[in-house]
């Protein structure tokens, strides 16, 4: 009787001491998933850093209908804080949504500040907006991060991972990941030449933002 009890205890202890083994194939899958998680964590940190330089730009256009009621239409696009000139905060944005606007405002953490179009580049469809620094609170000024613009000149970018922030999917605050698929196409526009980069990121008709 005593011998049988000892045997049962030994069996239970052995079962508890031997965890279920994982096959090499399963271990490899787990490693790949962990690597993907690490990659997306890094991309997420980069996205959060870049978004510190992004703002939402709202353009308001007024019109009058057939019974003389005033109608307001709004368009929203993404803006990139690039610099200041000591008096104004300078923001780069697409001009398409702003072209016929009666008023333009920029959102700083939900606080709307009036902006004016300072410069327009018709060739690229970009505009520089200006917001007086005096209109921003000290907290807002301290929270501003100026974007660091990159250059693709002389760099082999095909196959490089990229992320689009701003409103790449047509919704504010969205983010898309992809890679550069080509960089060899040259664009000859008025008084200038540009290199066209393409990616495999889905392009929404209402998209705006930066890569």
Q: Which residue stretches match the model-derived regions?
A:
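Short, conserved beta-turn/loop elements at beta-strand boundaries and strand-helix junctions
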Residues: 62-63, 74-75, 84-87, 99-100, ...
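N-terminal targeting leaders that route proteins to membranes or the secretory/organellar pathways
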Residues: 1-66, 72-73, 103, 137-140
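A conserved glycine-rich beta-strand in the N-terminal activation segment of trypsin-fold
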Residues: 35-45, 61-93, 112-114, 146-148, ...
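Residue-level preference for beta-strand/loop junctions
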Residues: 73, 109, 172, 193-195
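Active-site region of chymotrypsin-like
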Residues: 133-147, 176-211
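Extracellular/periplasmic catalytic domains that process cell-envelope and extracellular macromolecules
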Residues: 46-50, 73, 83-85, 120-123, ...
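Conserved active-site neighborhood of the chymotrypsin/trypsin-like protease fold
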Residues: 31, 83-166, 170-171
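Conserved hydrophobic/aromatic beta-strand scaffold that supports enzyme active sites
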Residues: 54, 80, 126-130, 175, ...
């Amino acid at each position: 009787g005593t011998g049988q009890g000892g045997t049962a205890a030994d069996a239970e202890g052995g079962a508890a001491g031997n965890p279920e083994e994982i096959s090499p194939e399963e271990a490899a899958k787990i490693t790949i998933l962990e690597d993907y998680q690490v990659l997306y964590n890094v991309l997420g940190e980069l996205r959060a850093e870049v978004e510190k330089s992004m703002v939402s730009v709202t353009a308001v256009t007024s019109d009058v209908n057939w019974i003389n009621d005033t109608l307001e239409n709004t368009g929203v696009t993404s803006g990139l804080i690039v610099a200041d000139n000591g008096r104004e905060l300078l923001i780069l944005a697409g001009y398409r949504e702003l072209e016929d606007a009666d008023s333009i405002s920029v959102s700083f953490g939900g606080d709307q500040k009036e902006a004016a179009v300072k410069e327009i580049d018709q060739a690229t469809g970009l505009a520089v907006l200006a917001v007086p620094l005096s209109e921003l609170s000290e907290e807002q000024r301290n929270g501003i991060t100026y974007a660091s613009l990159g250059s693709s000149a002389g760099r082999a970018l095909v196959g490089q991972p990229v992320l689009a922030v701003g409103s790449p999917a047509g919704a504010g605050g969205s983010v898309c990941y992809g890679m550069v698929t080509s960089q060899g196409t040259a664009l000859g526009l008025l008084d200038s030449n540009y290199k066209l980069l393409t990616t495999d990121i889905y392009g929404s008709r209402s998209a705006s933002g930066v890569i």
